[in-house]
Amino acid sequence: SPFGMVSSFFYGTIQAALFTLLAVYATSMNFTIFEISVVTFLLAISGAISQFPVGKISDIYDRRKVIVFSTFGASIFALLTIIVSRQMYLPGDLATSKTWFYIFLILFSFCSLPMFSLILAHTNDYIPKEKFVAAGAGLQFVFGLGAMSGPFLCSVFMDIVGSNGFFIFLFFFHGII
């Protein structure tokens, strides 16, 4: 499916940038080493936990709608993460706790990380069972092509825009899907 190929490419871009540059982003936002490890753990565990409920929902409802809802949710939570991260370092009572950053990161991960599974399932809905493996291999290949460009593009974007360019990049690419 053309949708599967295009979205797999862009999702490869997203996921590679996310996992390679999250620690760089957190470092640039003055997180401690422990806080960086917490951020990385929360991203991974919430993405893993989200696979089952999001997959179950996509079995009940139209997968395209679940993909749209997930990308919209990931975009919104990326935007909210940008907003709270800009306020974390305000003086005194004006500061927003990093707890809100963690919460929005978890919700972002919950929406974003099951995306490849949804794309693969959506593609499999339109092909005969005998072609599932070939389609999966093709989507994985295209995902890999996107993954090669993600960290480079995101780092250039972060250099131009600043640290929050990381989540702006994620917001933008989720919007493309």
Feature map (PLM): residue ranges:
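Helix-to-loop junctions at the C-terminal end of transmembrane segments
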Residues: 50-62, 158-159
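C-terminal ends and interior cores of transmembrane alpha-helices
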Residues: 73-93
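A membrane-interface helix-boundary motif in multi-pass transporters
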Residues: 156-174
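Loop-to-transmembrane helix entry/capping segments in MFS-fold secondary transporters
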Residues: 33, 127-139
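Helix-loop boundary and gating motifs at the non-cytosolic
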Residues: 4-7, 15-39
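Intracellular juxtamembrane helix-capping segments at the cytosolic ends
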Residues: 113-127
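Transmembrane alpha-helical segments of major facilitator superfamily
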Residues: 38-47, 139, 143
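Structural signature of the two symmetry-related core transmembrane helices
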Residues: 65-80, 171
